[in-house]
């Protein structure tokens, strides 16, 4: 039986300069007592803005939780208990991808409304109903599929533009794969991250990711390198966070993400998620013999995304480790079922070496 089309997205998305200090006006829709999660670096940089955003709207003084550890199931369950014990009625996550995954999982287990405030455009997870859980050693554990998307996403483009440039470029890598993975999922009659078929809206959003990167990606990086925001930067941030978030979740994931997650078994792989996805995409496009391969390779070269094992710092990887990565990729049955081109473990190892 054919799958029904299923779409999901955040309850509300707000983007613009200075919005972090104005978040109180939006949070008042969700509750009055927030459990606010961030890491030490975020607190040092943004604490005053965060507090002002609450005080301006007469919200209760938030409960601040500083956490620098991994996003493990045990950790988030304990924080969910703490949020409830402190009588909080909403969860707010402020930070990068890991911190937002933590906030999502805490809100899920505490059964509370959720607001996420990304401080970088390094990945497309903020808008999704997915939290990525890891083991204590940092290796990939599983996707925690949430009952709903975040109720509110607030993106302060001044904050995001000030993030390390490598993070935004990594976000381009994540967004770059969105269209091709959604296209593969649709061709394979696969399931998106909601368990349904990708619909037209999701595929349009996914395609818009690719078009936006081709139009604005290089210019946006140039502007960010000079320390300035611009229309190109605003479009890139929307692409990395919103368009790619909707596109991957409602469009589906395939080989590129399976490879990125497979690489996490290697302690020596220090690549950011989006960088690993970019490499995975190159492998996927080679497998599919996609006509866009050369354009993708040129774009990656211009913005500084990795396309080879050597670029990832894995030029000396052993055959045994490569086989281990291939085994991990094939254990990701959910993503691999959406890959339109058939591949064996042996062929995958060959493609990774040739990329």
Predicted segments, located by residue:
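ATP/NTP phosphate-donor binding region
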Residues: 1-90, 309
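Solvent-exposed alpha-helices and their adjacent loops that cap or buttress functional pockets
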Residues: 5-7, 27-29, 84-86, 107, ...
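A glycine/threonine-rich phosphate-anchoring loop and its flanking beta-alpha core
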Residues: 108-201
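Active-site segments that bind and position negatively charged phosphate/pyrophosphate groups
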Residues: 193-303, 310
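C-terminal charged capping/lid subdomain of soluble metabolic enzymes
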Residues: 290-355
């Amino acid at each position: 039986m054919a799958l029904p089309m299923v779409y999901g997205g955040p309850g509300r998305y707000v983007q613009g300069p200075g919005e972090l200090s104005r978040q109180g006006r939006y949070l008042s829709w969700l509750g009055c007592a927030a459990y606010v999660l961030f890491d030490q670096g975020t607190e040092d940089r943004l604490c005053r803005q965060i507090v002002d955003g609450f005080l301006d709207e007469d919200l209760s003084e938030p409960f601040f939780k500083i956490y620098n550890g991994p996003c493990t199931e045990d950790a988030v369950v304990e924080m969910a208990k703490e949020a409830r014990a402190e009588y909080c009625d909403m969860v707010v996550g402020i930070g990068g991808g890991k911190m937002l995954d933590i906030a999502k999982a805490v809100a899920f287990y505490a059964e509370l409304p959720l607001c996420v405030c990304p401080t970088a455009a390094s990945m497309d997870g903020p808008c999704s109903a997915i939290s990525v859980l890891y083991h204590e050693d940092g290796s990939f554990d599983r996707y925690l599929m949430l009952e709903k998307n975040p109720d509110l996403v607030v993106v302060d483009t001044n904050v995001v533009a000030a993030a390390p440039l490598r993070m935004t470029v990594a976000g381009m890598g994540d967004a770059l794969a969105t269209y091709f993975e959604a296209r593969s999922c649709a061709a394979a009659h696969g399931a998106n991250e909601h368990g349904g078929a990708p619909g037209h809206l999701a595929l349009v959003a996914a395609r818009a990711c690719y078009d936006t990167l081709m139009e604005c990606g290089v210019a946006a990086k140039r502007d960010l390198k000079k320390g300035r925001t611009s229309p190109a930067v605003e479009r890139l941030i929307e692409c990395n966070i919103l368009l790619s978030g909707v596109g991957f979740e409602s469009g589906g994931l395939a080989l590129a993400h399976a490879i990125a997650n497979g690489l996490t078994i290697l302690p020596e792989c220090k690549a950011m998620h989006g960088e690993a996805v970019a490499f995975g995409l190159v492998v996927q496009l080679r497998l599919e013999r996609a006509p866009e391969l050369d354009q993708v390779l040129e774009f990656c070269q211009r913005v500084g995304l990795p396309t080879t094992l050597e670029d990832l710092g894995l030029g000396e990887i052993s055959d045994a480790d490569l086989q281990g990565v291939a085994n991990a990729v094939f254990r990701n049955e959910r993503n691999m079922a959406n890959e339109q081109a058939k591949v064996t473990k042996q062929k995958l190892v060959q493609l990774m070496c040739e990329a």
